[in-house]
């Protein structure tokens, strides 16, 4: 498939890119190459291929979400430079 100059300018505008003429020509060639490759992939017979979500078996490796004991609030605030109403007091970051 031939990628014309208007398509390159449209895509560049969507991506908010300013391209020189040389960059537009290179991008056109690159996109043509990519589209050609995808066209070849579309020609493959995948009727006997089982659809998968992942090519490798993946399982959830997160731990169970369970309630656990934590430090008492007074112990955590013991070394705080500043505290207020049982909470850490930190400098204002956003106006």
From Swiss-Prot:
MF (Gene Ontology): asparaginyl-tRNA synthase (glutamine-hydrolyzing) activity; ATP binding; glutaminyl-tRNA synthase (glutamine-hydrolyzing) activity
Reactions that this protein is recorded to catalyse: L-glutamyl-tRNA(Gln) + L-glutamine + ATP + H2O = L-glutaminyl-tRNA(Gln) + L-glutamate + ADP + phosphate + H(+); L-aspartyl-tRNA(Asn) + L-glutamine + ATP + H2O = L-asparaginyl-tRNA(Asn) + L-glutamate + ADP + phosphate + 2 H(+)
Superkingdom of source: Bacteria
Short name of any one Pfam family annotated for the protein: GatC
Keyword Protein biosynthesis in record: yes
Signal sequence, renumbered to the chain: none
This protein's record includes keyword NAD: no
Broad enzyme group: ligase
GO biological process, one term: glutaminyl-tRNAGln biosynthesis via transamidation
EC nos: 6.3.5.-
Keyword entries, A-Z: ATP-binding, Ligase, Nucleotide-binding, Protein biosynthesis
Gene3D superfamilies attached to this UniProt entry: Glu-tRNAGln amidotransferase C subunit, N-terminal domain (1.10.20.60)
Its biological purpose: Allows the formation of correctly charged Asn-tRNA(Asn) or Gln-tRNA(Gln) through the transamidation of misacylated Asp-tRNA(Asn) or Glu-tRNA(Gln) in organisms which lack either or both of asparaginyl-tRNA or glutaminyl-tRNA synthetases. The reaction takes place in the presence of glutamine and ATP through an activated phospho-Asp-tRNA(Asn) or phospho-Glu-tRNA(Gln).
Family affiliation: Belongs to the GatC family.
Subunit and partners: Heterotrimer of A, B and C subunits.
NCBIfam families noted in UniProt: gatC
Protein name per UniProt: Aspartyl/glutamyl-tRNA(Asn/Gln) amidotransferase subunit C
Organism, scientific name: Acetivibrio thermocellus (strain ATCC 27405 / DSM 1237 / JCM 9322 / NBRC 103400 / NCIMB 10682 / NRRL B-4536 / VPI 7372) (Clostridium thermocellum)
